[in-house]
Amino acid sequence: MALVELRDIRKIYHVGDQDIAALDGVSLTIDAGEFLCIIGPSGSGKSTLMHLLGCLDTPTSGSLLIDGVDVSNATDDQLSRMRNSKIGFVFQAFNLLPKLDVLHNVELPMVYAGVSAKVRRERAIAAIERVDLGHRMYNTPLQLSGGQCQRVAIARAIVNNPKIVFADEPTGNLDSKTGETILTLFRELAESGCTIVIVTHDNNIASRLPRRIEMRDGRIRVGVEAAKSQTAPLLVSHPTPQKGEEAQP
Amino acid sequence: MNFWFGLIIGLKEIGAHKFRSFLTMLGIILGVASLLSMFALTEGVARGMREMLAASGGVQRVEVNNKEPSEEKQDLAFLSPGRTMDDVAALEKGASLVDLVVPEMNQGMPISRDNKTLRLKAIGTSPGYFELGILELEEGRLLAQNDIDQVNRVVVIGSDIPGELWPENPSYRPIGESIRIMGVPYRIVGILKHYESNAAKRKREAGVSDAQLKRRMARMGKTKKKMRQYDQFWEKNHCIAVPYSTYFNDFRTASNADGSPNRKLDRLSFRVADIALFDETLTQVRSILDRTHRGIDDFGFDTREEWFDNIESSIRATRTSGSLIAGISLLVGGIGITNIMLASITERIREIGVRRAIGARRHDIFVQIVVESGVIGVIGGILGLLAATGVVQVLVLLSPVENAPIITFSAVMISFGFAVGIGVISGLYPAWKASTLDPIEALRYG
């Protein structure tokens, strides 16, 4: 079933007396369990699209359903709830809180979800062990390498069992070898059933994912997606359902 | 968000910038310290005054004093006999709302025994004197109506007199012994209890002996005489009370310039039977005295109530002005907190963005910042209270015993509450600013 459904989304920014359409009529469906990427040059609208999908912002017009909930006109508090319970973020710059140790960084989303301290601790430990950092539990981010930081960020993103994880250039600040291990981690997560959306401008990454959505000038490029998704080597072992309705008619 | 979590974050934030946080708190610390010291000082003064008031007979006691008659009666003023025993008789007979009338004639006189002479105020009065002034007997008996009627030469003395007239044996209770008042021998029939203020009692119990006190006074360049004004019980302990009839016979019969007896009282006090009828009582007494004074309004009332009100209002005034100054200090401290919190959230815009991205609501961010500044207020308040305790200790050493500052629980709570309140209020604007940051902008920041 469709986890995310976008219908004719527009996002218009007012800059001075000019209106700039960052997204200009985007329709898209993402199914549960998909592992896909959004690719495009800077200024193509991919970040804006991710912000909308990630409930950090609301569209100017069009409808946006996430897990069956229409968030296109949601209030700030509703969006916060959505982000907290259904969405996980992984950023290029990791964005861990430098004063908290690994454990507390990972616990943080559950604090805002109102999970009790005991359960929080258990689930955080499980998530940290899942990204192989059980031995770094009480280190602060400053004592960790970039790859380790990103793994902590992933643990934080998945600790609330979100429906979908957004990764914005997750390998952008890492060397290629470390980036590879992070991608492998995402792949493992995808295999275990998590829906993952990677936003990148790196074709190397994009070409290895089961599905790619290419953005250009605020629109999804017609045809590219379907072609790529068929030729791309399937890195994910289980077959990914493809609907191919995302492109604009 | 969990309040405790916010508290922990706040403490960590303060711990991460110890010096900066301390400087921020300094305003609050000074504000609270000055507020509490001021409360303690005025409370000390108030206690001292209330103690003095209670010692002098409380608000029920009213004194009839001399007053300039009003202008149109000034030419007739000679008609009035002034305050005399006639007033006492008239009041005892007619003033139903008064339950005690006490006349007093007094004058400083040499009090001697053998070759030792004291110069003290001898008082000619009635038995009611002891009741009105709340003077209790330690040994012997008080003056009785019989003494008045029979014009006995008897005297009741304060507890410090024996020690000063019999210095060779301070514990001697000289009941039945004779002392001379202006050369006239009087027999001691009673010795009053020793009176001391609570402060003096505390001091004595803390082990400050007279010798120590004398040394201390010598060090401070004060003689015992100078210290008198600080002891409201000095007069009680140096009481020389004789029957007014005897006093009149011995000292007043030819004391006017023309050789006539001086019948005037030096003091006339009465006690209001029911404090609820205070004003009615004064009216009644006024109308009776109008008759005995032949319509000349040459008397007025000195009520302790007025005195009490004056004390209270002057304390209130001191308290208000002190609070204002301390309040300004607290306000400055609050502005300091606001300033630092604003700097702190600018430093942490990205952190706020991250918190928002992982699901913190605006409200959560708001609470976090307010809790942080509240914690500064709480810690500043606690340090301020400690500082005030130190300041008060110093003041206790410096100030006169009766007015030693006192820290009361409510003063502590008020000062502390102010500190916390200022901390929280100063955090409101930064918290609002932080909570309205756009998460996308905040994530991009820096």
Positions of predicted regions on the chain:
Chain A
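ABC family nucleotide-binding domain
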Residues: 2-215
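H-loop (His-switch) and adjacent beta-strand-loop-beta switch element
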Residues: 212-225
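ABC-family P-loop ATPase nucleotide-binding domain
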Residues: 1-12, 222-249
